[in-house]
Structure formats: structure tokens, C-alpha cells
């Protein structure tokens, strides 16, 4: 058996091929797993659990079917869907996890997260993140009419795209000191995350021992997952 990790699907109605690929994944590979962990940015945007978007209901039902089949499903918020709440989690059968979680997997201690908190060189993004994660601001935003939230979200996405276009790739990647600090804080030799869309397995030193950082890929033209078994940790790409 295996535990599966995915992230950065950025599901939206404009990308039906990705949605179809995810549905096939849920109906196939996911049903064979010990557990499924979604490490953020499942959706391109999330403006509240009360959004009647049919795609959201379709995904909730599909994930719930996996959960009902006996495969526990877990979710860590990403920078695109950090407002995903308890209502959607309940409808989809997912358990919401904190932004950093340590798992005991087949004899390994593994730290999982979305990964945006590791990009500490991007000071502008970190300041924005700190602001939008304030509970009072989230409560205020979610109290706004849905059409207002949609306009605000569209403007924020446009601003983010414009800001990122002028940033270097290095700034938007993880900071190595932040990686080591996180792994040493949790006393782990394995870290799995997404966010950067740069799939790879990196070797480093943490806790004065060899350590590994496994980065999930985004679902653009193919799927990406990390498969953890008793024997191996594999980064796998597969066609939709």
C-alpha cells in the first residue's frame, strides 16, 4: 500500500482537461491508497464555501466517494484556496490540517505543507500573506456579498500575476535556510510540499544528517504526485 500526495491542481472551469484528469485519478489510483493528502491550491480560487460554483460540488462529491471507499482524505490550505472551510471539508469528507503537519509514514517522519511559507525571500508576498490570514479580515471578507467577493478576488489575481511577472525566479523559490529551519524545528529528514511548481527531489543536510525535500509539480499538461511506501518515496508524473 501507499500514501499519496498531490498539490497545485488549480481547478477551474476554464481548464476542463485538468478536472477530467483529477476525476480519473480519484476513481483509480486514489482508491488504492492508504490515504490521500492534498497540499493546497486544489482550486485556482476560493471565495467562500457558499459559492454555488457547480465545479465545487462536483469535486466535493468525487472526493467524498474516495473517503467513503475507506481512503482517508486530508487537506492543507494553499495560497489560492486558504478560505476553504469546514463546510466544504465536511461535504467532501476531508480532514483539514494545520499549515505544517508531521506524519509517521512507514518508519519515516515526514513534514508536509503547501510550501509558500518557505519562500521568505519574497517579502512582498509574505507581507500580503500575513495580512490576508488575519482572522478578522477573513471574517469581514466572507461577510461580503458573493458578487463583491468575486470582483475582489479577480482584482487580486490580476495584481498577483502582474507582480509575479517582474519578480525573479529565485525570489519566488524557497529559501534554503527556511527549509532547514522548518525541518530542524520538527526534527524530520523528509519534507514534501508544493507551491513552487518546480517538481524535484532535493538532497540537503538537516539535523546534521542527510535529508530530502520533495517538491510536487503543478497539474498543467500532466498529473503529479508523490507516492510514499515502506520501500520508497517517489515523485511521479503521469498523463491525464
Swiss-Prot record:
Mn(2+) 1 binds at residues 8, 10, 41, 197. Its cofactor is Mn(2+). Pathway: Glycolipid biosynthesis; lipid IV(A) biosynthesis; lipid IV(A) from (3R)-3-hydroxytetradecanoyl-[acyl-carrier-protein] and UDP-N-acetyl-alpha-D-glucosamine: step 4/6. It is found in: Cell inner membrane. The gene is lpxH. One of its GO terms (cellular component) is cytoplasm. One of its GO terms (biological process) is lipid A biosynthetic process. It comes from the Bacteria. Binds 2 Mn(2+) ions per subunit in a binuclear metal center. This is UDP-2,3-diacylglucosamine hydrolase. It catalyses: UDP-2-N,3-O-bis[(3R)-3-hydroxytetradecanoyl]-alpha-D-glucosamine + H2O = 2-N,3-O-bis[(3R)-3-hydroxytetradecanoyl]-alpha-D-glucosaminyl 1-phosphate + UMP + 2 H(+). It holds the Pfam family Metallophos. One of its GO terms (molecular function) is manganese ion binding. Its EC number is 3.6.1.54. Coiled coil: none annotated. Hydrolyzes the pyrophosphate bond of UDP-2,3-diacylglucosamine to yield 2,3-diacylglucosamine 1-phosphate (lipid X) and UMP by catalyzing the attack of water at the alpha-P atom. Involved in the biosynthesis of lipid A, a phosphorylated glycolipid that anchors the lipopolysaccharide to the outer membrane of the cell. Keywords: Cell inner membrane, Cell membrane, Hydrolase, Lipid A biosynthesis, Lipid biosynthesis, Lipid metabolism, Manganese, Membrane, Metal-binding. Signal peptide: none annotated. Substrate binds at residues 79-80, 122, 160, 164, 167, 195. Its main location: membrane. It is a peripheral membrane protein. It comes from Escherichia coli O127:H6 (strain E2348/69 / EPEC). InterPro entries: Calcineurin-like_PHP_ApaH, LpxH-like, Metallo-depent_PP-like, UDP-diacylglucosamine_Hdrlase. CDD domains: MPP_YbbF-LpxH (cd07398). Mn(2+) 2 binds at residues 41, 79, 114, 195. Belongs to the LpxH family.
Amino acid at each position: 500500500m501507499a500514501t499519496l500526495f498531490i498539490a497545485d491542481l488549480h481547478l477551474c472551469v476554464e481548464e476542463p482537461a485538468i478536472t477530467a484528469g483529477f476525476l480519473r485519478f480519484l476513481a483509480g489510483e486514489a482508491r488504492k491508497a492508504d490515504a490521500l493528502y492534498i497540499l493546497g491550491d486544489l482550486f485556482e480560487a476560493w471565495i467562500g464555501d457558499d459559492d454555488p460554483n457547480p465545479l465545487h460540488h462536483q469535486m466535493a462529491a468525487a472526493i467524498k466517494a474516495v473517503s467513503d471507499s475507506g481512503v482517508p482524505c486530508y487537506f492543507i490550505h494553499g495560497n489560492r484556496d486558504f478560505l476553504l472551510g469546514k463546510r466544504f471539508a465536511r461535504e467532501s469528507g476531508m480532514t483539514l490540517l494545520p499549515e505544517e503537519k508531521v506524519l509517521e509514514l512507514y518508519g519515516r517522519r515526514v513534514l508536509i505543507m503547501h510550501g509558500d511559507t518557505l519562500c521568505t525571500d519574497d517579502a512582498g508576498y509574505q507581507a500580503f500573506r500575513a495580512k490576508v490570514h488575519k482572522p478578522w479580515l477573513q471574517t469581514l471578507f466572507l461577510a461580503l456579498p458573493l458578487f463583491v467577493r468575486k470582483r475582489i478576488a479577480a482584482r487580486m489575481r490580476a495584481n498577483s500575476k502582474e507582480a509575479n511577472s517582474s519578480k525573479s525566479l529565485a525570489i519566488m523559490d524557497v529559501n534554503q535556510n527556511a527549509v532547514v529551519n522548518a525541518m530542524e524545528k520538527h526534527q524530520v529528514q523528509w519534507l514534501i510540499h508544493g507551491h513552487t511548481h518546480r517538481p524535484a527531489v532535493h538532497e540537503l543536510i538537516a539535523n546534521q544528517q542527510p535529508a530530502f525535500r520533495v517538491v510536487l509539480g503543478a497539474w498543467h499538461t500532466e498529473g503529479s504526485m508523490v507516492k510514499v511506501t515502506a520501500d520508497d518515496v517517489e515523485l511521479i508524473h503521469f498523463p491525464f
